[in-house]
Amino acid sequence: MEYKDTLLMPKTDFPMRGNLPNKEPEWQAKWEEEKLYEKIQEKNAGRPTYILHDGPPYANGELHMGHALNKTIKDIIVRYKSMAGFSSPYVPGWDTHGLPIETAIAKKGVKRKEMSIAEFRKLCAEYAMKQVDGQRTGFKRLGINGDWENPYITLLPEYEAEQIKVFGEMAKKGYIYKGKKPVYWSPSSESALAEAEIEYQDKTSASIFVAFKVTDGKGVLDEGTNIVIWTTTPWTIPANMGITVNPDLDYVVIESAGEKYVVAEALLPSLREKLGFEDATVVKTVRGSELDRVVTKHPFYDRDSLVMNGEHATAEAGTGAVHTAPGHGEDDFLIGKKYDLEILAPLDDRGVFTEEAPGFEGVFYDTANKMVTEKLEEVGALLKMEFITHSYPHDWRTKKPVIFRATAQWFASIDAFRDDLLAAVKGVNWTPAWGETRLFNMVRDRGDWVISRQRAWGVPLPIFYAENGEAIITDETINHISELFREHGSNVWFERDVKDLLPAGFTHPGSPNGEFTKETDIMDVWFDSGSSHQAVLNARPELSRPADLYMEGSDQYRGWFNSSLTTAVAITGEAPYRNVLSHGFALDGEGRKMSKSLGNTLLPGKVIKQLGADIVRLWVASVDYQADVRVSDEILKQVSEVYRKIRNTMRFLLGNINDFNPTTNTVSYENLREVDKYMLIKLNDLVKNVKDSYEAFEFSTIYHQINNFCTVELSQFYMDFAKDVVYIEAADSHDRRAMQTVFYEAVVTLTKLLAPILPHTTEEVWNSLIGEGAESIHLQDLPDVKVLANSEEITAKWDAFMQIRDNVQKALEFARNEKLIGKSMLAKVTLYVDGEAKTLFDSLEGDFAQLFIVSDFELVEGLENAPESAFKSNQVAVQITVAEGETCERCRVVKKDVGVNPKHPTLCGRCADIVVKHYEA
């Protein structure tokens, strides 16, 4: 007889290597074929809903690690909720209008000006849908479970129709108006931009000090006195209409080299050196309020520049007197309106000067900086020029500088319902908590929202104009356009004449001849995605508004969180979300932003081909995603190592329950040994902790909890000593079935707990466990937290034992290093104990030699009896010696009774009994 044939070695079809890049697509094909998403919805029908509303990614370009981070977090949440008693449908979406798509079409050599807008828009739509298809394939390969056959896409007619309704409702409430005021203008995009489309970058600019000569001093200043201004935008001097001083600041008139100059008193010390005023004497001091309506002359145009009082003039920098061009700045505009100045903005859409700026016609504004400075020097008005580096607004798409430019635009008035917006922010639950402050401050401080864009690819502003110029936005026109868009798509606006867009027989007092025109601007793309609560949550039967959760990157406080809140509060009076969760950005291993120029980009598609989607997903679960996160080949290698440990744990558990039938072989809790109960209690604690962490969206905690459980409780303890039972004992012995009961419970529990994070691997485990015809793991519910008898008492005892076991392990390691023993199985452990430790061991049931994975064990009372050579700690002393006896050929334990059965001279008594009883014919 070959004794090795009497060992019950692990057997499983679950392979050691995951081979994820090849296996995952097979599972995905199976899920699609079996309509798993639909089955999950059917299973959860009638349960309370949990709606995570997908913020739409922009349909342009390859998926990056930020996409993978975002979509995986969402998928983990939705999968968790779907296994936790909720109906949690997930409808993915895409944002498909806007400049990047126009730019992409232009890069293909398409000449926009040589075709109709409608034709150009068709090309944009085709391109966007191709991008959607490419990204959809990428998201599905990542294992994201959702309604991929019916996503929401902002260019679809039914979406645009609902967006028009949102606009109409806001107009009806008086929140939409047309006005001329300075807005962020991007010459590179030839369009107005909203605050959300601005990012700040360092820029080097010319900083100039300019003298404006007084022509009417109002009895306060002498004629010919110079008021000194400072600006970092010399190109705006041609648009200067005034100078602003603070009414509550003191200003000094100084005399230097026969000329008089006015500056803020507080700034004089710094200006003496900068402007060469070292020897200047102070002639008089005046309050800013006394300078109100003093008249100066523009340095090189024949027009006045009025001195005005304004709070925004400060003594923090410059001269305390602010150059004011009402067409090129918000503060300038507001004070210009107050003083009835002309709102002059002499630039065209491309940032080129018009004839309203004589001497600079046809010159790009940035190029004009040098020309303006030279002109000021020529007329003797330039006191100083230097270069400074400062933070300056840029177009977040083109990365080029933007300017403030007064143009006629359509706005959504925020002032009209700002208090409601702020109250709504307070009513939402924010994670991280600082999100509330961030959005609250943004809403509190933001100006009105410029919603018009001078572009082609977007949803048209549904506005008509009467013959007298009056804008027409009525229930009748809005409903008609909404239905036209629903039937034909928004391109109909550009394909049809005005008369064919208006309701039949439409009349308006402003058009006695029945003539009308239509608006040519489109809506800000943030209005598109910001209307999704109406076009998706409110429109789809399986969804509802408000959503339970909006979850996006932290850049969306100024973006989607903000625009969605604005439109929702405007039309419904409440926020579109109950909870908002935000994540940071994916950076490289050194914490740098990923970019092609740095060559540090890591694409999820490439990682999935090499390692598999479950590794990307496990990386997402491993990071503290609420801050910026790092990813690199090295980091993914570490994650892969944790995956390997989890997989090996599953394989060991599966392999050792191959002959276990849970229906007939399960040992009831009360009949388990205490150490088995201890493991089930630990497993139950894991269930509670993991479910709490899922609920709090703390996935990195789950990653560590499960990794620790697999490594510490299972691999290093229970599974390790279990081999002496499950391999060695008779198949149906009580102790073996008890341990298999724990193994079975552990593999079922771990598989369910990990299913939201590792959907492919857990499906593979589940199929191996249940066998042919197994219903998907993703149709199961998470395990319940159980009430287990005496759990506190058992935990306290065995936790204390585990601490002592750690000391024994250290002593064994020391003995191995000192060559006192070879393998631990050759050792005898003598444990010297006092007090509490003695009481503990008296109360424990178990084969301690087996638990310590040694051949012999002796407990001795009295620490004082321990020899000098013993390994000592605070409670115990451990003496390691070589076990007496011979090694049993079957169980490899050193026993004194080897050969007790003469028929089996190389076996210990235990093994001989098992062989005689179960394997001898």
UniProtKB/Swiss-Prot annotation:
Its EC number is 6.1.1.5. SUPFAM superfamilies: Anticodon-binding domain of a subclass of class I aminoacyl-tRNA synthetases, Nucleotidylyl transferase, ValRS/IleRS/LeuRS editing domain. Its cofactor is Zn(2+). One of its GO terms (cellular component) is cytosol. Binds 1 zinc ion per subunit. L-isoleucyl-5'-AMP binds at residue 552. GO terms for molecular function: aminoacyl-tRNA deacylase activity; ATP binding; isoleucine-tRNA ligase activity; tRNA binding; zinc ion binding. ATP binds at residue 596. A motif ('KMSKS' region) lies at residues 593-597. A motif ('HIGH' region) lies at residues 57-67. Keywords: Aminoacyl-tRNA synthetase, ATP-binding, Cytoplasm, Ligase, Metal-binding, Nucleotide-binding, Protein biosynthesis, Zinc. Its main location: cytoplasm. It catalyses: tRNA(Ile) + L-isoleucine + ATP = L-isoleucyl-tRNA(Ile) + AMP + diphosphate. One of its GO terms (biological process) is isoleucyl-tRNA aminoacylation. Catalyzes the attachment of isoleucine to tRNA(Ile). As IleRS can inadvertently accommodate and process structurally similar amino acids such as valine, to avoid such errors it has two additional distinct tRNA(Ile)-dependent editing activities. One activity is designated as 'pretransfer' editing and involves the hydrolysis of activated Val-AMP. The other activity is designated 'posttransfer' editing and involves deacylation of mischarged Val-tRNA(Ile). HAMAP family: Ile_tRNA_synth_type1 (MF_02002). Monomer. Belongs to the class-I aminoacyl-tRNA synthetase family. IleS type 1 subfamily. IleRS has two distinct active sites: one for aminoacylation and one for editing. The misactivated valine is translocated from the active site to the editing site, which sterically excludes the correctly activated isoleucine. The single editing site contains two valyl binding pockets, one specific for each substrate (Val-AMP or Val-tRNA(Ile)). This is Isoleucine--tRNA ligase. It comes from Listeria monocytogenes serovar 1/2a (strain ATCC BAA-679 / EGD-e). The gene is ileS.
